[in-house]
Amino acid sequence: NRLLKQLYARKIIDNSTYELAISEPLPDEPHPLPQTAPHLVSRFYQERNGKYSISTIDRGIQTQIENAAERWSNEFNRSDIRNLAILVIDIRTNQVVAYCGNVNFERKQAGNQVDVIQAPRSTGSILKPFLYYAMLQEGSLLPHTLLPDIPVNINGFTPQNFSLQFEGAVPASEALARSLNIPAVTMLQRYGVPKFHTFLRQIGLKTINRPASHYGLSLILGGAEATLWDVTNAYAYMGRSLLQLPQTECSLLLADAEGS
């Protein structure tokens, strides 16, 4: 209203315009802009230099995973875990249908603007299914093959299960389902670290880029780093292989936007 009064005093607006303007209610505070897949938007901006892009994201699935991320973030905050990411790939089309690089994008103090999908993190136990897959494919392992879950010492390396217990003879399928460490280590010893290292590189785990000897048997227990992007694509590789689908490169863009 002060501005309107000044405009009227300087005869920039007439009296009727002034009276009509001050009688208008003040507008409400503008709604915040939607923050759908903000980390993906940032990725497109960096990789495509702001070029017009049409993503493969499914809005419904994206909304579901963002809600799930927010819900689990509230749970993890109790354990002082501030960052998480979710990536969903449709293995039949090999398109990314949901991309949540982190939670609370607007919060800078907890590193929430970091796209965790592209950030290397410890592999933990996430490589175990790849070892089982590789051994199943070559016929050196069956789901019911009994594996030893007993105390072992391999050149001074003594792996332990999370429970600190030993189960004796365990079927391979159960050892995988329970993520038992000792069977995984003995399997890797039998399969060969260099061979497994090569396989992981072949299926796209690019950040496992040091010699196999650098990792040793700890490779199967989190002794390496990988990105969620590479790991999810590698899991999609296994899924497509089992469904006998062609192995194509994962896409974030619709084909008709590639040349735009």
Where are these regions (language model features)?
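Conserved catalytic neighborhood of penicillin-recognizing serine enzymes
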Residues: P30-Q46, L141-F196, R240, Q244, ...
